[in-house]
């Protein structure tokens, strides 16, 4: 039995020439918290907690009262054609952003292997390089580059996916 891509994968395949317009999650080694944009499913605004966020340049100003949320992202694996749901807790929510920021440090603290060195900088690159892998799963997420930023495509999951997909 041959697995067929789901509708989200079909859309991604048909839009190969316009990769930049697809929602994505970027690795950000300077962030100390996960930052989620508009393409996530917020399932809990933690007791209406907020915080003020200082940017890398103090002259830009502080983002005031940024909500802290629990939310989910969907990842459509191009190899298995399965959709995985990533649950992110205590994340900053900035809905004006079209992408998400994920600190590799936080992935590593959770026991997830994050190799953020691009393959062009590896002596003998393999599938393990420039990827995110999970110790208790066969899932491996290959990373891509947008300029110098490593990223992978994610999107807002549907209600049905929240209930039925692997987390």
Model-assigned labels for residue ranges:
Residues 1-21, 27, 147-167:
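Intrinsically disordered, low-complexity interaction arms of viral/retroelements
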Residues 2-8, 12, 52, 78-84:
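Residue-level signal for well-ordered alpha-helical segments
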Residues 8-56, 89-103:
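Aspartyl protease active-site motif detector
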Residues 48-50, 64-167:
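Aspartic protease core domain of the pepsin/retropepsin superfamily
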Residues 54-65:
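C-terminal reverse transcriptase regions that engage the nucleic-acid substrate
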């Amino acid at each position: 039995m041959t697995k067929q891509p789901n509708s989200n994968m079909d859309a991604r395949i048909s839009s190969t020439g316009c990769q930049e317009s697809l929602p994505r999650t970027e690795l950000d080694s300077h962030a100390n918290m996960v930052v989620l944009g508009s393409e996530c499913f917020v399932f809990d605004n933690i007791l209406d907690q907020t915080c003020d966020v200082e940017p890398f340049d103090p002259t830009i100003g502080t983002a005031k009262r940024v909500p802290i949320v629990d939310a989910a992202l969907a990842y459509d694996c191009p190899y298995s054609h399965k959709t995985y749901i990533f649950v992110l807790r205590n994340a900053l929510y900035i809905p004006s952003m079209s992408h998400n920021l994920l600190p590799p440090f936080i992935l590593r603290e959770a026991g997830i292997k994050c190799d953020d060195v691009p393959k062009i900088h590896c002596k003998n690159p393999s599938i393990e390089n420039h990827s995110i892998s999970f110790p208790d799963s066969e899932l491996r997420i290959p990373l891509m580059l947008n300029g110098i930023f490593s990223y992978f495509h994610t999107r807002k999951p549907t209600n049905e996916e929240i209930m039925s997909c692997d987390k």
